[in-house]
């Protein structure tokens, strides 16, 4: 039917495994550079991402890569996914819940179960934008 590639997606339980085994998983975020203060534990520092990726391109393109973004509607994760697959990585997945889901779970359960690089109090800053609240053009 065509040569389509399904994007592998993971849930928060898979992400908990990834953060506990950094020797197996590289965790990459797609948040803007201005929003790097609160990240999921063991996320690669944005300033080191390029050199680490270049190292693995040469040494091990089968490394497990986990990408996450700001929230479930963050399209930057798909762009990063395509970029990594295009340059040769074969085990790439997206944690679709992103920082928003992670911070909500941290707030409900425990920061030991959902660790971050710092405590974030403004969880709603990570929520996805509303689709229905955007004014639509109407014929007059």
Briefly describe each language-model feature range.
Residues 2-17, 21-25, 30-66, 71-140:
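Rhodanese-like catalytic fold shared by cysteine-dependent sulfurtransferases
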């Amino acid at each position: 039917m065509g040569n389509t590639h399904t994007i592998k997606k993971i849930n928060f339980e898979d992400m908990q495994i990834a953060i506990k085994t950094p020797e197996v998983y590289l965790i990459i975020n797609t948040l803007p550079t201005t929003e790097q203060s609160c990240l999921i534990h063991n996320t690669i520092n944005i300033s080191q991402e390029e050199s680490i990726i270049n190292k693995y391109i040469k040494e091990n393109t089968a490394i497990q890569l986990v990408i996450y973004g700001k929230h479930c509607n963050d399209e930057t994760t798909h762009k990063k996914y395509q970029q990594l697959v295009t340059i040769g990585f074969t085990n790439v997945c997206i944690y679709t819940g992103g920082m928003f889901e992670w911070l909500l779970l941290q707030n409900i359960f425990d920061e030991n179960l959902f660790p971050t690089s710092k405590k974030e109090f403004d969880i709603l800053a990570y929520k996805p934008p509303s689709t229905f609240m955007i004014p639509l053009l109407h014929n007059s």
